[in-house]
C-alpha cells in the first residue's frame, strides 16, 4: 500500500498483512491542497472527507463564496459500460495520490470581441485521485472473506484553475483498463452557498431558455417556479421545482456578486442546477412522464443530501434518461464560479473564454463582424408569412430523401400564393437597397425555401431540404443584385429541430451557399427534438450543434444558432460561431413583451458564455400601429440604441422595418455609425436588473461609443470622459431620452445633442423609465 504524506513531496511505502486494517486507515488521512488567484483574492481548498469524498471550498477576500461542497459522478450499471452491471460510482473512497500546482500567464487576441487583447492568468491545482472498487463473488456473499474480494483501481484528476475573478474546475478521466467506457447517471458537483442570496434565475429546462428571468431569494425559488415557466413555449421540459439554469447570477447580503456557469461544453450534456432547500427530500434523477412537467416524486439517493442553499449539478438526459456516454481519455466541461464585490467585474470577466481552447481554425480571414437587417420582423409580428401558399394542410417534399414517396408532391409553381409571403423578390430587393444605402453588411431572408406550410410542432422529420426556393424567390438574381450593391444575403436554415434531416442535407446546403456567395447562416431549432425523445441540451444535440459549426467552417461560413444550447465560450475555439440566441430575444416583444429590466439582466447571465443575437433596434414599439398585433416593446428609442453597446455581439441586427427607420432617420444615424468590433471596453457602472453603462473603443480607430440602459425606474448618471485620449478632441453626439420620455406612454421621445468634448469633461444624463442613451465620440 502507498500512503502519500499531506504535502505529497514524498511518500512512504507500507506493507500490511491485514488489508482490512489498511482500508480502514485510508479515510482518516489528512489530505488537502490549496491554490490562490494571482492577486491573492480568491482561494480554493481541496480535500477528501472522512468517507473519501472529494470536497472543495472557495473564498474571496477571506469571505465565503462556496462552503464545503462535494464532487463526484454517479455512473449507470449498464451493459454498454466497460464494467457492465458491476459498475460503481465515482463518489467516495478516494485517496489523493498526487498534487501539482502551476501558474500560467498569456495574452491572446480574439478574432472579434469586446477587447483587442485578453489576458489569461491563473494558478492551477491538479489533484490525482485513486479509487478502489470491489466485486463481491458468491463466496463472499455466503460469508467467506479474503481472496473473493477483488479491488480495481480507477484514477481521475480534478483540476482547478483560479483567476482573480473566480475559478473553474473539471473532472478528467485518463485512459485506463478499469475506466474505458462509462455512462453517466448524474454528475454531483455541489455549490454550497453561504446564505439566502438574491438570485436572477431561469427555470431549469432541458429544451428552452426563452423565459423571463426571475428575481428572488434562493429560499423563494420553489414558491415562484410554477408561475415562472412559460408553459406555452413550443418546447418545455422543466425538471424540478427548484431547478434553475446557468448562467446563474446572485448577490449576497454582504455585497458579493457570484455567478455559476460552465465553460467549454463539448461532447457533454448541458448543466443545470438543482437547489436543495428546506423542503427537498431527494434530488431529481431524470425527467419522467409528460414532456413538460417536473418529476413529482424523485427517489432518494444513496448519498447524503447536501445542506439547504446548496446547488447540485443536474445534466440534461438523452432519450434513454442517461446523462452521458463517455470514452476515456476525456474530461467534463469546466464548472465555473465568478466572484467580485463590484458588479462591473461580472461583465468584464473573460474567465469563460479563457477556459476554452485556443482557436482551432488555421485561416480566420473570412470571419468578420456583421451588421444586418432582414425580412424577419414582419413575419414575427404576423404581418407577413414564412409560407408561400395556404392551399395545403400538409406537404411532402421530393428529392434524395424521398425516392419512393407515393404521396402527391406539391407543385409550388401551380400553387396559389397566399399574398402574404415575405420572402419575395420585390421585398428582398427593397431590403437590399436599404442595407446598401445605410452601410449595412447583409440582409437576412427567412421563409425563402419550400416547406414552411406545416413546418412547426408536428414532429415532422423530413421538413426542409434547405436548397429549393419558393417560386417568388429568385436566389440567383437576388444574390447577384445584392453583390452589385456591396451587400450579401444572410442564409436561414430553420431545422424544425430535426437534427437528422439537417445533417442529411447540410453538405449540399452549404455548397449552395458557396455557389451564390453567402458567408453566414442563421440556424433554428424550434420545437421538440428529432430523434424523438431527445432534448435540445443533451450530449448528442450539443455534439450536433458543434458539428454544424465545424462543417460550416470548412465552407467558410459563419453560424448564428437560434434555439440551440446556451453558449459556454466555444466561440474562442471556433470563432465562426458568431452568434447565438439561447434566451428570450426581441421576438418576444411581439409575443406579449418582456419587462424593461430584461436587458439589464442578460449581460450578467446569458451573455457570460458568448454573444447573443438579441436583434435590437425596434423604433415603432406599438405593433398595432402597423399590424393586427396588440403587443408592444417596453423600451424607448434611446434605450433601443443603447442595446447595440450594452448587449455585446459581433452580429448586430437593425430589426425594425426600413420604413420605420426612415421615419426616425436622425436616430437611425447611430445604428449606421456604431461598430460591432472593439479594441477596448470599459464598464462604467452596473447593477443587475437596474442599469448598465459601458464605453467601447472601435476596432482600429480612435472613436468611442457609450451606451446606458436602465429598468422601469429610470436612472441618472454622471459620465466622466476620463477614458478619452487626452491629446484629442471629439465630436460628441448624444442620443438621449426626452424629458417626458417613458417606455409606456412616450417611447419615441428623444433628443439629439451635438458638441465638442475632450478628456476630463463630464456629461450628466437622465434615462427615462425603460430608456437609455447612446453616444458617439468621433476623434477630430
Predicted segments with their positions:
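C-terminal beta-strand-rich structural cap/linker in extracellular carbohydrate-active enzymes
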Residues: 754-780
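Hydrophobic h-region of N-terminal signal peptides that target proteins for export
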Residues: 23-32
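An acidic-aromatic substrate-binding cleft motif
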Residues: 327-430, 438, 442
Amino acid at each position: 500500500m502507498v500512503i502519500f504524506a499531506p504535502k505529497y513531496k514524498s511518500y512512504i511505502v507500507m506493507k500490511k498483512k491485514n488489508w482490512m486494517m489498511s482500508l480502514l486507515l485510508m479515510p482518516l488521512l489528512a489530505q488537502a491542497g490549496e491554490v490562490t488567484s494571482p492577486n491573492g483574492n480568491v482561494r480554493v481548498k481541496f480535500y477528501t472527507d472522512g468517507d473519501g469524498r472529494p470536497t472543495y471550498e472557495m473564498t474571496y477576500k477571506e469571505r465565503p463564496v462556496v462552503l464545503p461542497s462535494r464532487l463526484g459522478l454517479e455512473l449507470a450499471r449498464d451493459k454498454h459500460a466497460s464494467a457492465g452491471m458491476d459498475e460503481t460510482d465515482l463518489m467516495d473512497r478516494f485517496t489523493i495520490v498526487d498534487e501539482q500546482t502551476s501558474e500560467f500567464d498569456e495574452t491572446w487576441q480574439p478574432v472579434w470581441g469586446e477587447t483587442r487583447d485578453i489576458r489569461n492568468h491563473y494558478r492551477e491545482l491538479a489533484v490525482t485521485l485513486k479509487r478502489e472498487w470491489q466485486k463481491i463473488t458468491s463466496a463472499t456473499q455466503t460469508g467467506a472473506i479474503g481472496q473473493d474480494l477483488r479491488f480495481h483501481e480507477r484514477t481521475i484528476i480534478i483540476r482547478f484553475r483560479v483567476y482573480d475573478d473566480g475559478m473553474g474546475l473539471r473532472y478528467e478521466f485518463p485512459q485506463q483498463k478499469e475506466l474505458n467506457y462509462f455512462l453517466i447517471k448524474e454528475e454531483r458537483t455541489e455549490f454550497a452557498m453561504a446564505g439566502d442570496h438574491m438570485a436572477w434565475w431561469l427555470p431549469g429546462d432541458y429544451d428552452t431558455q426563452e423565459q423571463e428571468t426571475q428575481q428572488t431569494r434562493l429560499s423563494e425559488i420553489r414558491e415562484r417556479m410554477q408561475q415562472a415557466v412559460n408553459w406555452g413555449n413550443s418546447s418545455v421540459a422543466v425538471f424540478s421545482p427548484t431547478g434553475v439554469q446557468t448562467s446563474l447570477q446572485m448577490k449576497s447580503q454582504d455585497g458579493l456578486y457570484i455567478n455559476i456557469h460552465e465553460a467549454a461544453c463539448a461532447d457533454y450534456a448541458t448543466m443545470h442546477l438543482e437547489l436543495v432547500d428546506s423542503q427537498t427530500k431527494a434530488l431529481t434523477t431524470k425527467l419522467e412522464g409528460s414532456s413538460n412537467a417536473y418529476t413529482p416524486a424523485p427517489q432518494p439517493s444513496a448519498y447524503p443530501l447536501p445542506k439547504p442553499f446548496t446547488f447540485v449539478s443536474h445534466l440534461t438526459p438523452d432519450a434513454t434518461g442517461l446523462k452521458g456516454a463517455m470514452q476515456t481519455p476525456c474530461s467534463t466541461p469546466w464548472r465555473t464560479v465568478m466572484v467580485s464585490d463590484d458588479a462591473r467585474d461580472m461583465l468584464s470577466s473573460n474567465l469563460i473564454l479563457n477556459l476554452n481552447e485556443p482557436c482551432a481554425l488555421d485561416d480566420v480571414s473570412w470571419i468578420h463582424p456583421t451588421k444586418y437587417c432582414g425580412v424577419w420582423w414582419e413575419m414575427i409580428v404576423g404581418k407577413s408569412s414564412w409560407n408561400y401558399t395556404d392551399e395545403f394542410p400538409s406537404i411532402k417534399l421530393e428529392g434524395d430523401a424521398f425516392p419512393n414517396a407515393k404521396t402527391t408532391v406539391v407543385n409550388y409553381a401551380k400553387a396559389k400564393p397566399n399574398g402574404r409571403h415575405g420572402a419575395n423578390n420585390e421585398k428582398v430587393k427593397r431590403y437590399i437597397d436599404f442595407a446598401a444605402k445605410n452601410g449595412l453588411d447583409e440582409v437576412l431572408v427567412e421563409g425563402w425555401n419550400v416547406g414552411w406550410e406545416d413546418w412547426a410542432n408536428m414532429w415532422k422529420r423530413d421538413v426542409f431540404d434547405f436548397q429549393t426556393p419558393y417560386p417568388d424567390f429568385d436566389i440567383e438574381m437576388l444574390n447577384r443584385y445584392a453583390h452589385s450593391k456591396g451587400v450579401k444575403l444572410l442564409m436561414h436554415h430553420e431545422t424544425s429541430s430535426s437534427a437528422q434531416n439537417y445533417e442529411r442535407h447540410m453538405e449540399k446546403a452549404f455548397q449552395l451557399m458557396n455557389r451564390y456567395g453567402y458567408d453566414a447562416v442563421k440556424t433554428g431549432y424550434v420545437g421538440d427534438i428529432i430523434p424523438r425523445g431527445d432534448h435540445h441540451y443533451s450530449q448528442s444535440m450539443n455534439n450536433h450543434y458543434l458539428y454544424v459549426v465545424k462543417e460550416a467552417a470548412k465552407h467558410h461560413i459563419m453560424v448564428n444558432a437560434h434555439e440551440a444550447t446556451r453558449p459556454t465560450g466555444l466561440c474562442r475555439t471556433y470563432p465562426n460561431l458568431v452568434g447565438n440566441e439561447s434566451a428570450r430575444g426581441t421576438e418576444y416583444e411581439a409575443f406579449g413583451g418582456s419587462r424593461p429590466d430584461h436587458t439589464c439582466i442578460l449581460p450578467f447571465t446569458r451573455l457570460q458564455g458568448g454573444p447573443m443575437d438579441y436583434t435590437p433596434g425596434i423604433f415603432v414599439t406599438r405593433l398595432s400601429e402597423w399590424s393586427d398585433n396588440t403587443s408592444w416593446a417596453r423600451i424607448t428609442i434611446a434605450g433601443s440604441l443603447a442595446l447595440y453597446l450594452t448587449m455585446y455581439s459581433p452580429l448586430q441586427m437593425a430589426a425594425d422595418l426600413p420604413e420605420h427607420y426612415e421615419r426616425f432617420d436622425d436616430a437611425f444615424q447611430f445604428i449606421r455609425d456604431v461598430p460591432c468590433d472593439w479594441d477596448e471596453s470599459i464598464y462604467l457602472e452596473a447593477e443587475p436588473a437596474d442599469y448598465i453603462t459601458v464605453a467601447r473603443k472601435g476596432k482600429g480607430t480612435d472613436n468611442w461609443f457609450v451606451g446606458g440602459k436602465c429598468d422601469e425606474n429610470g436612472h441618472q448618471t454622471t459620465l466622466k470622459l476620463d477614458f478619452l485620449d487626452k491629446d484629442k478632441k471629439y465630436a460628441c453626439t448624444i442620443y438621449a431620452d426626452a424629458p417626458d420620455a417613458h417606455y409606456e406612454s412616450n417611447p419615441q421621445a428623444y433628443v439629439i445633442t451635438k458638441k465638442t468634448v475632450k478628456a476630463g469633461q463630464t456629461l450628466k444624463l437622465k434615462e427615462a423609465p425603460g430608456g437609455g442613451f447612446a453616444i458617439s465620440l468621433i476623434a477630430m
